[in-house]
Amino acid sequence: MEIQKKIAVVDFGGQYAHLIASRIRRLGAYTEILSNEEPLSSYQKYSGIILSGGPESVYEPDSPTITTKLFELGIPVLGICYGHQLIMKLLGGVVERSGTGEYGPASLELHSQNGNSLLKNFVGGEQVWMNHADEVVKLPEGFSRIASSKDCGYAVVENSSKKIFGIQFHAEVSHSEKGSVLLENFIQICGASRTWGIDQFLKEKIKEIQETVKPEQKVFMLVSGGVDSTVSYLLLCKALGAERVLGFLIDTGFMRKGEVLPLQEKLKSQNIHLTVRDESNLFYESLIGKSDPEEKRKIVGNLFLEARDRAVKELDLEHGDWLLGQGTIYPDTIESGGTKHSHTIKTHHNRVEAIQKLIEEGKVIEPIRDLYKDEVRDLGLLLGLEREWVGRHPFPGPGLVVRMLAVEKTSTDEDQKEIDSYLSTQNGLSGRILPVASVGVKGDRRSYANCVVLNDVETDWKTLDRVATHLSNQFSFINRVVLLPFEKEVKNLTFRFTGMHLDKKCSDLLREADSVVESLIFKAGLYNQIWQMPVVLLPIGEKENEKSIVLRPVESQEAMTANFFPMKRELLKEIKTEVLKIPGIRYVFFDLTNKPPGTIEWE
């Protein structure tokens, strides 16, 4: 698609490079992703350039950089997070390690009332989303401060004469209020064309699939039951014809309760035939004694491939030229370290080594790999899926196995004393560090740290949000905070690590809890208000073999950022009461963690 006035996003390896491009496209301007090592002539083709965030520090040796001649082209430039810091450093400013870092929401304070073009229609007090450990402490000559936050002195800066801008927060994520307004303002500054839309993506993607898949080739599509793989399946069928796409669902033993048959019926109503194979015993056997989240994901990914190979042989498909179809979306590739400078947050099951090898050999097709969840849903509607279907909560490809935590992680007495010292100033709140670790993301890097549980003294959600954000920002050994609802005291409770077996017994336990929670959310009419609600099984109890449940309701749009859903306490009490009726469950926790620093899934 050739558009004259388009915007380039230079990828420095952050989780958000492609999300920036996606957001700009949603505003109607076409974007393309470029590396930071392009010749100057490549950048000259664009009407605007955005430098993305990234996991490195600009003052580190060998950190990614870009030619300073870029700033002499007369093209508007916007730096976001790492990109902002890089502009400041290259042009003579100073960047240093931040005292505390900022992860999550912050409030903007404006310092300019001169009608700054980038912050047009901002009034001050807007919430923005931070994710940084470094900060600018001195501006280059010619730049002025436009806005700050409580912990960031230079949240927005500009050189108005050269149209060079820097922002420390992530305007591209849905949790930055007026983030789209800021990006819209930048598009206007650039004078970019406004001709992009999801319908255009569909037309181009169909053409691309037809050109990529040879006439003699067919696609073996792994369908998980989620929205992503279903939309991918429909898109491939539309482009190639249903006779060239074989849908295959592997029952791993870690699917949701009563999911397989309704899924087959739903796809049949869309004229899609789905072959289902029960491989649960193999998955259970292969995961015996496994606990590390990365190892679990890789085992699941490899087992999917082995099951596919057996099916190909048994269905006598070996003699054809087959491609593997996957419902990969962009956050999957980003969290797996899918761009040049990005860090692996967690390896997705469709990014294990064996599948990477197939990708390199050109034997994998992923038709929606450049889209985000909200765009996938829009595409599903365009392809004829019901709104109820595309609005289903996301479910991880590996299934419940990534919601069953098994790694013990002890903390020190000094760590607990630090937590106690802070919470002693928080109006009756107290906390304990739980002996279990979960995956998170801080400053675009993977974190693997402990969780703090807080007592419940009927503190309002806003205050709990503030306290949870401070705990995860201030203490490097913490990346997640949970509440123990309706329990005024946690100091005298026993939180014992009880171990976890990735077997049918434990998966049945989680399946039942998940089903109870989902039914109550539907009953309350909140299913469509909550973007996703993972129910997590923890190896935490008072007695041997007891387990606990974590409720993780979040609000999001694209899965790159999220905040916890402030549930009404009456409903929370009902959910807790019903879940505790399940034999073997000791505690019910409520997750107060935003993303960042915690990923939506615990592993």
Model-derived regions: residue spans:
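Short amphipathic alpha-helix with an adjacent loop that forms part of the alpha/beta core around
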Residues: 37-46, 120, 310-316
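Flexible gly/pro-rich beta->alpha loop and the following alpha-helix that scaffold active-site loops
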Residues: 4-9, 14-80, 84-85, 91, ...
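Structural beta-sheet core signal
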Residues: 9, 51, 79, 166, ...
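N-terminal segments that mediate ammonia production and transfer
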Residues: 161-195, 578-580
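Glycine-rich phosphate/diphosphate-binding loops that line cofactor/substrate pockets in enzymes
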Residues: 1-2, 42-45, 209-217
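Short, basic, low-complexity termini and linkers enriched in Ser/Thr/Gly/Pro
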Residues: 41, 109-117, 269, 425
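ATP/NTP-dependent adenylation/nucleotidyl-transfer catalytic domains that generate, transfer
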Residues: 190-603
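Pocket-forming structural segment of enzyme catalytic cores
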Residues: 61-80, 85-177
